[in-house]
């Protein structure tokens, strides 16, 4: 491993490894199966704090890390064993290259890359109270018209916004929340008074 590679910021490393995995599984025509295997692995990683700490720790040898990653992959019941093997081999490469600390970011970047290939976009919707399924569908259709692709909604309820919505789509944010409108009104009134 070259010293210059160690200086590359982790998000860029995430993207490069994710792209490499995506290119490989696309060639192997197993994108969907590997995507499911990655999702299964991320669920396990998210549920086990000890595993998260292990992945983040630089104090374990490569041999120990390889052994643990192999064991984790063997214990996950992947729907497709071939996809599980691809993921296991990929985890070994990451471990040997001392990038295990970036594992979560790499796998999330892979999921993002797969979504982009399908022209899917994630949108986070924050509302003061839960939206009805009809409202969610109308919102999804409106956003799909804007992005010209499939939109996956991630709903979140935050009563502190009082009303309205906050929509985060990529690097854009549309904030129509009542709390923001009240803050704007407060600032405008302060300007008028002074």
UniProtKB/Swiss-Prot annotation:
It is a peripheral membrane protein. The keyword Cell membrane applies. The keyword Acetylation does not apply. It comes from the Bacteria. NCBIfam families: ATP_synt_delta (TIGR01145). F-type ATPases have 2 components, F(1) - the catalytic core - and F(0) - the membrane proton channel. F(1) has five subunits: alpha(3), beta(3), gamma(1), delta(1), epsilon(1). F(0) has three main subunits: a(1), b(2) and c(10-14). The alpha and beta chains form an alternating ring which encloses part of the gamma chain. F(1) is attached to F(0) by a central stalk formed by the gamma and epsilon chains, while a peripheral stalk is formed by the delta and b chains. F(1)F(0) ATP synthase produces ATP from ADP in the presence of a proton or sodium gradient. F-type ATPases consist of two structural domains, F(1) containing the extramembraneous catalytic core and F(0) containing the membrane proton channel, linked together by a central stalk and a peripheral stalk. During catalysis, ATP synthesis in the catalytic domain of F(1) is coupled via a rotary mechanism of the central stalk subunits to proton translocation. This is ATP synthase subunit delta. The lineage of its organism: Bacteria, Pseudomonadati, Pseudomonadota, Alphaproteobacteria, Hyphomicrobiales. The gene is atpH.
